[in-house]
Amino acid sequence: MSNALQRRGLHGVGVSELLSQAACPKGVLYHHFPGGKIELAIAAIDSVVTRMQVHLAALAEQPEPLQALADWLVQAEQQLQTSGFEQGCPLATVALETSADDTVLRAALGRAFARLRCSLGALLEKAGISPLRAEALATLVLSAYEGALLQARVAGDNACMHTTSSLLLEILRHEQNNNKLEPL
C-alpha cells in the first residue's frame, strides 16, 4: 500500500488494485480494516513512519550523525530518480489530496509528521545541537525536504533536492559547530 501511495496517492489507487497486489479477497480488507481504504492508508502511513523512525534512530547512533543524514539524503535523491520521479513521500502525496473534510486522515498525517520531527530532533541532538534548536531545525529539515521532493517530482529533476540538502547540511553543521546561538 505504501508504494502505491508514494506513486499515485490515495485517490489514484483503487481498492481493487490494492486487493490484487495483496492477493486477497475483498472480505479480508473490510474484516481487518472496517474503515476501508482510509483506514488502510492510515495503517500504511503509520507503518512507513515507524520504519523511518527506526532508520533515523540508527542514523543518530552513527559516529557522525550529520554525515549519516547527508548520506541518507543522497540516497533519497537517487531513489527518486531511479523511480522515474514517481516514488515520493507517501505522507506528502496523501496530504496534498486531503480536504478540510478529511479530519481523520489529516489527524493521522499530523501525528505522522510530528513523529518524524521528533525523530529528526533526536538525531540532531545526538549530533551535538541543543534540544531547543534541534526541535526547530527538525521542523525546517522536514519542511524543506518535503518541499524539495515535491518540486523534484514535478520537474523530473533532482537539482532542487540537491540544493536543498546541501544548504540544510550547511546550516546543521554550522549549528553543530556554533552551539552558542540563542533558541528560536
Task: Kindly give the residue locations of the regions a language model identified.
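Short hydrophobic clusters on alpha-helical segments that form packing/core surfaces
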Residues: 1-5, 145
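Helix-turn-helix
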Residues: 4-39, 43
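Hydrophobic alpha-helical connector segments
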Residues: 57-87, 138-141
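All-alpha amphipathic helical-bundle segments outside canonical DNA-binding/catalytic cores
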Residues: 63, 107-108, 126-142, 156-159, ...
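Amphipathic alpha-helical segments used for helix-helix packing
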Residues: 67-71, 82-107
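Amphipathic C-terminal alpha-helical segment
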Residues: 79-82, 122, 142-159, 171-177
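Hydrophobic alpha-helical segments that form the core
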Residues: 92, 132-151, 163, 167-170
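Hydrophobic alpha-helical bundle segments that form small-molecule/ligand-binding pockets
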Residues: 101-103, 113-137, 174-181
